[in-house]
Amino acid sequence: MKVIFLKDVKGKGKKGEVKNVPDGYANNFLLKQGLAAEATNSSMKTLEAQKRKEEKDAAAELENAKQLKETLEKLTVELKAKSGEGGRLFGSITSKQIVDAMQKSHNIKLDKRKFEMDDAIRALGYTNVTVKLHPQVTATVKVHVSEQ
């Protein structure tokens, strides 16, 4: 019996796959558990339409990420912090503070977990911070820390 997997089934198939499985296995397990649906003409058409929609959504998401990258790479995020001798900060600048500053000054809202910082910023001056917007799109934001 041909079935369309609705969920990943270990050793049998992944979500969205169409496979031929034994009738008893399909009727007694896959269909009853809601793990698969019978592969009829209408369900095949629905699956194709769903795949096209997912591809279209993924392409739109990638395009949005590319546009956001262009915007971010033109920006400089300005932050003020107290510092001691030699330009060392009292404390540090974290990704959350960068996100808050971007929200206030440029009205761009990002998740702080998208910032790839090995360590917090601990010195005055300019620092480049990478932001992973999409698995295929990475931007660099310039952060300027000045004395308060």
From Swiss-Prot:
The keyword tRNA-binding does not apply. InterPro entries: Ribosomal_bL9 (IPR000244), Ribosomal_bL9/RNase_H1_N (IPR009027), Ribosomal_bL9_bac/chp (IPR020594), Ribosomal_bL9_C (IPR020069), Ribosomal_bL9_C_sf (IPR036791), Ribosomal_bL9_N (IPR020070), Ribosomal_bL9_N_sf (IPR036935). It holds the Pfam family Ribosomal_L9_N. GO terms for molecular function: rRNA binding; structural constituent of ribosome. It comes from the Bacteria. One of its GO terms (cellular component) is ribonucleoprotein complex. Keywords: Ribonucleoprotein, Ribosomal protein, RNA-binding, rRNA-binding. GO terms for biological process: translation. Belongs to the bacterial ribosomal protein bL9 family. Binds to the 23S rRNA. PANTHER family: 50S RIBOSOMAL PROTEIN L9 (PTHR21368). This is Large ribosomal subunit protein bL9. It comes from Bacillus cereus (strain AH187).
